[in-house]
Amino acid sequence: WQCTYVPHGINSDDFKPIDETDAKFVQFRDELSQGNEYSFIVYFNNRNIRRKNPGDVLLAFKTFTDKLPEEEREKCALVMHTHPVDDNGTDLPAVAEALMPDLNVIFSGAKLETDQMNYLYNIADITINIASNEGFGLGTAESVMAGTPIIVNVTGGMQDQCGFRYKGKILTAKDYEWVHSLHERKKWKDNDWGILEFTGDKGAVPAGKENKLMQKNFKICMAKFLAAVKELQ
């Protein structure tokens, strides 16, 4: 018997790159930003619980913006779609006020429709998930489908979302029929099948963001933010 187990799937009709001139999208974006124009937006979509490390995301954002000139710092924003205060997590507005009262932190705590969630991914320049023991990472998978790059831990299914190269070829969903799992170090270390290379540290380019990734300022911001996250680890 050949069994295949698919734990999660993302509907490409729901999460996808959209036209930034779409009237509903523009209205949603303007309401979220309250009329402010940001040049770089970091997006966090997770529960406010200890394992998801929302406080660390706030600290990483502060560490990142501390490295920027004031005029660039004012154009950066962190959007957190989560319950701002949760007994299982922390009081995020209080943390933000204590750590970075002068920075742009936007909380999105209301329940949203699927199309509105897709708007958030399209608004963002990057989506971050640094949760510990993350099994799959639905939010970052949705982000990639929407064409927005991700910053993640090398853990669980999130590393698969960044891509692996085997014998010079990026693995596809079809390849996993014989790969099964990439998370067994002994299986892939010093084997005769070829070298398995993790490509996430080089940066994947999801569909729809090619032009953005070619912009010098965007690439600089990505590098600085990733450095800030690593600095906290």
Predicted regions: what they are:
Residues 9:
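Carbohydrate-associated surface elements
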Residues 16-35:
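A short helix/loop element that forms part of the nucleotide-sugar donor recognition site in Leloir-type
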Residues 34-52, 58-61, 78:
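Conserved donor-binding/catalytic core segment of Leloir-type glycosyltransferases
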Residues 72-92, 110:
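Glycosyltransferase donor-sugar binding loop
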Residues 89-115:
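Nucleotide-activated donor-binding/catalytic signature segment of Leloir-type glycosyltransferases, i.e.
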Residues 118-124:
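Short alpha-helical donor nucleotide-sugar binding micro-motif in glycosyltransferases
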Residues 132:
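Aromatic "clamp/platform" in nucleotide-sugar-dependent glycosyltransferases that forms part
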Residues 149-152, 169-174:
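Short hydrophobic beta-strand element within catalytic cores of glycosyltransferases
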